[in-house]
Amino acid sequence: LMSMDTEEMLRAQPMDACVLIGGCDKTVPAQVMGGISADVPIIQLVTGPMLTGSFRGERVGACTDCRRFWASYRAEDLNDGDIEEVNNQLVPTVGTCGVMGTASTMAITTEALGLMVPNSACAPAVSADRKRIAEKTGEISVKIANENLKPSKFLNEKSFMNALIVLSAIGGSTNGVVHLTAMAGRL
């Protein structure tokens, strides 16, 4: 649904290029799918991952640790105060989950496709790099608009094979295979 919404908005608006802003699991692939289908110059700007937290000296992060701590709470090994403290540490800053889940996987593979500023997928959401990345994304959006650099001009089977190789190299989410296949199907 989001990919269709993105596609229709891109087709309906008189724009020369579009900066797609997303972050979590399904937003990035949906936006890219819509952009590929609309075949207008696009560049993705992801929000970046959150920082990890700490609970009783242990490094913790959203997604990876929440189920384990919730099970401990249900087993009454943690009390109400403990689980509140854990919750505050599982999501200590803004950003996508700070693990190699689908959000990080799709940011990295979208960068591998050439649809993002190089070295922008993993900069934390709260870092000063995010502003620099956003500025560079804006610069590139003007360039791709002037060159009318549509996805159909540079995305191909080799692009997606490269993204799959990157996916394997990073040990990314298996959801990445599904999303990359769906994105490639829009060419």
What are these regions (language model features)?
Residues 1-162:
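Active-site cavity-forming subdomains of large catalytic enzyme subunits
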Residues 35, 110, 168, 184-185:
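Residue-level preference for well-ordered alpha-helical positions
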Residues 177-187:
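Alpha-helical support elements that line or immediately flank enzyme active sites
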